[in-house]
Amino acid sequence: MAHIEKQAGELQEKLIAVNRVSKTVKGGRIFSFTALTVVGDGNGRVGFGYGKAREVPAAIQKAMEKARRNMINVALNHGTLQHPVKGVHTGSRVFMQPASEGTGIIAGGAMRAVLEVAGVHNVLAKAYGSTNPINVVRATIDGLENMNSPEMVAAKRGKSVEEILG
C-alpha cells in the first residue's frame, strides 16, 4: 500500500492504494491502474476519490480531482468525534469512538488516512468484515456523515443545547 502526502494550498492529500487491473480482450490483456485517494483540510472537511487510467500518475490525478469535488463537512469536537459512530458500506463495517486527549489515532490502514486528513487527532476505531480499502473508506465517511453535534440534535428537537447535554 503506497502512501503519498502532499499539501495543496490548505488541503492535505493522501494516496491510499494503487492497483493494477486488466481487461481481457481478443488480442490479450489491457492493463490499467486504479488509485484511491483522500483529501481533507484537517478541520472537518474530507472527501475521497477513485481514479482509473492507463498510467499511474494520471490515475492519481483523476482520483485527487474526484476527491476535491466530493468533500463533506464533519462536525468535530476538539479534535475527536462527537459520539461513538458506526459506518457501513457493502461488506465493511467500521466502529469509531471518541478518545481523550493524547490517545492519537488508533485505526488501521485506509481508515487512519481518512481520519488524519479530516482533522481527527484522538479516536479509537476498528474495521470489521471486508478490509477492502475502497469499502473501508466509504464506510468511514458514512460513519462521519452520520455523526451529529449537540447543536444539530438540539435544532432537530427544538430544544436548547443545555437540555440535550443534560
Swiss-Prot record:
Keywords: Ribonucleoprotein, Ribosomal protein, RNA-binding, rRNA-binding
Single GO biological process annotation from the record: translation
Record's keyword annotation contains rRNA-binding: yes
Single GO MF annotation: structural constituent of ribosome
Residue pairs linked by disulfide bridges in the UniProt entry: none
InterPro entries on file: Ribosomal_Su5_D2-typ_SF, Ribosomal_uS5, Ribosomal_uS5_bac-type, Ribosomal_uS5_C, Ribosomal_uS5_N, Ribosomal_uS5_N_CS, Ribsml_uS5_D2-typ_fold_subgr
Domain S5 DRBM: 11-74
Cellular component terms (Gene Ontology): small ribosomal subunit
PROSITE patterns attached to this UniProt entry: RIBOSOMAL_S5 (PS00585), S5_DSRBD (PS50881)
Record comment regarding domains: The N-terminal domain interacts with the head of the 30S subunit; the C-terminal domain interacts with the body and contacts protein S4. The interaction surface between S4 and S5 is involved in control of translational fidelity.
Family: Belongs to the universal ribosomal protein uS5 family.
Subunit composition and interactions: Part of the 30S ribosomal subunit. Contacts proteins S4 and S8.
Chain's role: With S4 and S12 plays an important role in translational accuracy. Located at the back of the 30S subunit body where it stabilizes the conformation of the head with respect to the body.
Record's protein name: Small ribosomal subunit protein uS5
